Amino acid sequence: MSIRDWPAAERPREKLLAQGAAALTDAELLAIFLRTGVAGCSAVDLARRLLAEFGSLRALLEAELPDFSQHLGLGPAKYAQLQAVLEMARRHLAERLRRDSALESPQAVRDYLKAQLRHEPHEVFGCLFLDAKHRVLAFEVLFRGSIDSASVYPRQVVKRALANNAAAVILTHNHPSGVCEPSQADRVLTQRLKDALALVEVRVLDHFIVGDGEPLSMAELGWM
């Protein structure tokens, strides 16, 4: 049965307009993005099929083009649309964070860092640069690849902190495995960067590790 033949209250688009996006299932949200199904398969049925094939909504959203395009109903055009939507979401969070007078909400920082790093298929390391009132100056990804004390150069972090005229920084990196548990290498790296930045009077406020669930704060664990 075509979605057009469904009761209006059950159609994803009408349901979203009446109840808000949070009321929709992953499949219903994806169906709105897909817009149409394929022969013998409504957009909602296709969405359910895709979620089953990828294993989760997150896996679908983070898929790279070659894998994404192998699935029925998807291709380069849909991939481009999806990347545009994800980038708009990241920029929205960045703009919202910059509008805040100061970083008074740890949750706002967590939400922002999740949006920036969770989609990354490989390890990346970045810095959130702040002024003396902890207002956001910039966020930059500085290193990509295996993140450890040998691959992250304190001199480069210091250079970018000075270029942004930062008074403080929040360090962050992701664990693509999804496990947020800090390693000994993470603790060593954090201390090296704290020592280097202290020489130019820039404070390291925290180091967040992004994986599945909520980003982990090393400061909250007492490891700063």
UniProtKB/Swiss-Prot annotation:
Query: What is one Gene Ontology biological process annotated in the Swiss-Prot or TrEMBL record?
Result: proteolysis
Residue intervals of the MPN domain = 102-224
Could you tell me which Pfam families the record lists for this protein? RadC, UPF0758_N
Q: Which domain of life is it from?
A: Bacteria
Which key words are in the record? Hydrolase, Metal-binding, Metalloprotease, Protease, Zinc
List all membrane-crossing ranges.
Answer: none
Recorded GO molecular functions are: metal ion binding; metallopeptidase activity
Residues binding Zn(2+) are H173, H175, D186
InterPro entries in the cross-refs: MPN (IPR037518), RadC_JAB (IPR025657), RuvA_2-like (IPR010994), UPF0758 (IPR001405), UPF0758_CS (IPR020891), UPF0758_N (IPR046778)
Q: Which SUPFAM superfamilies match?
A: JAB1/MPN domain, RuvA domain 2-like
Motif JAMM motif extends across 173-186
Family per UniProt? Answer: Belongs to the UPF0758 family.
Under what name is this protein listed? Answer: UPF0758 protein Pmen_4376
Q: Whose protein is this, by species?
A: Ectopseudomonas mendocina (strain ymp)
